[in-house]
Amino acid sequence: MLKNDVWIRELAERGGISPFEPSQVRRIDDRPVISYGLSSYGYDIRLSPNDFRVFRHVPGTVVDPKKFNPGNLESATLHHDTSGQYFVLPAHSYGLGVAIERLEVPNNATIVCVGKSTYARCGIIANISPAEAAWQGYLTLEFSNSSSADCRMYANEGVVQLLFFEGDPCSVSYEDRQGKYQGQEAEVTIARV
């Protein structure tokens, strides 16, 4: 069952979302921001200003998810102007960022991550795997810029929405099976096998 704001707030009070914003934030110091925080049936997390990487072409190489070469990624520059802090995701490229919020998923829940419409209308597709039962850490966020124009990715502002689904307790959680992305730190985690 999809969980509501009351359930999400209780999860946060137990340390399940940290830091936690108990309402939708749309402005900071009279400046409009891409919304983040608690909504009726979800929670919008923010993009960290600390780590954003963009794929680059390395002649003679092919990206191999089984033997991922970190050299295929380059750190993006954090820019700042009156609109806020942002990274630039070039046209037709792919970038990896990390969430500001740390998550601890209950044993009987799974979190599905979906893109925000503000970014989707600019050609940005968010592709984040679900956070399964008992997963904990900082989500690595994956973004594809499908448009023919470069796009700003705003740090410290909303970037994806989390939907929380509760079910019957599972027999083996992500933590139990020692999932390879368990305990991710507040930095981009590259592909693992």
What are these model-derived regions, one by one?
Residues 1-193:
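Non-catalytic terminal segments and appended small domains
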